[in-house]
Amino acid sequence: MAADRHPDVLVVGGGVIGLATAAALLERDPHRSVTVLERDFIGRGASMYPGAIDMPYFRTALHRQLVEASWAWHEARARETAAYRREVPMTWFVDAEIDLPSHVAPPLTSGARGIPPGWRAPEGVREVVGRSFVIDPEAWCQALAQEVTRSGRGQVVEHTPVVALDEDARGATVKCADGRTYSAGHVVLALGPWLPDWNERTRAWSANLGLRTKRVFGLNIAVDESLRANAAVGWPGADMYFHPAHGGGGYRLSLRHDEWGVDPDAPHEMADVVIERASGFLDLLLGKGRWSVSGHRVFVDSYTHEFEPVIAPCRALGERVTVATGTHGSGIRLAPGIAELTARTVLSSLDQKRGVA
């Protein structure tokens, strides 16, 4: 389609959240147009770093809603999603004090042994088996971008950093680094960890919400051939998740390490304490000398105190601005649910602005 500088909705941020939101908007309202503005290549921000395990784990009622909506979205598009999302059996290591069934959406099977031969569970945990999927985030972003452009009402513009946003009675206007402007009836900011410090107004707004950035660590793991299997393990009590990469050729280990207030554009180095924790877990699970670190992924995401995503108007920037952020390292697996909720919020605002009840 020809360049549209005046769409109904502008989405700033071409990661999986922004692209999924654009696709949801176009699907929900066949009369709307949407333009996605991405400062780099699509999917090259925080979306490219996660290990990308799609597990049905939730902490709160909103979190559960987003998990269930996301899984339903994928199941409704099973033929398309098979290209970038594949199933992996998940064994949960459950400590005595954790009521896992209250935090996992689909049914679980107690007593069934899920870990492969040669793998070992930590002492004192129960093993519970469930479903999970691994995702190729880059392939998914490409598929979402194609869905947006194929609609005939959407476009994706790369290498277009947005540096300012203003609003008047007619709508919102964003200014790009190259001087171009785009205007729309509504703007969605899907900036991931770049939102809190995007400008002074978002900085104050984020501080009021308790929205902060935190470093997130992941390791690429090579495993001895005799121990390789299409299997994943999750240990909520230790906040560790181990699973094969979507394309094969290795495994991914994600683990928590609290380092707050991090600039997403600063150099990110692996922390020794993270390697030590990973070693303790993998030596137990696989055995010493049976695995090695083949690479690492260090990135940044935004978090709230409640570990709940924020999908809300940002009146610090204007009445026509909605923010989708605070994904606490789970943006890949929650993206469809976040997109659906964001799309409903945006379309409701547009209808209200046009005087529709």
Identify the role of each PLM range.
Residues A3-I17, T35:
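Beta1/beta-strand and adjacent pyrophosphate-binding region of the FAD-binding site
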Residues L10-V12, Y182-L195, A339:
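Short hydrophobic core segments
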Residues A23-A24, A52-D54, A83-E87, L191-E319:
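Active-site substrate-recognition segment that forms the wall
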Residues L26-S47:
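Glycine-rich FAD pyrophosphate-binding loop
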Residues G51-V125, D239-Y241:
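Dinucleotide-binding Rossmann-like beta1-alpha1 core, especially the glycine-rich loop
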Residues A82-W92, T109-V148, R256-V262, T322-T327:
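Helix-loop-beta segment of a Rossmann-like dinucleotide-binding subdomain
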Residues Q155-A172:
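A conserved short coil-to-beta-strand element within the FAD-binding core of flavoproteins
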Residues G287-A357:
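C-terminal catalytic lobe of FAD-dependent flavoproteins
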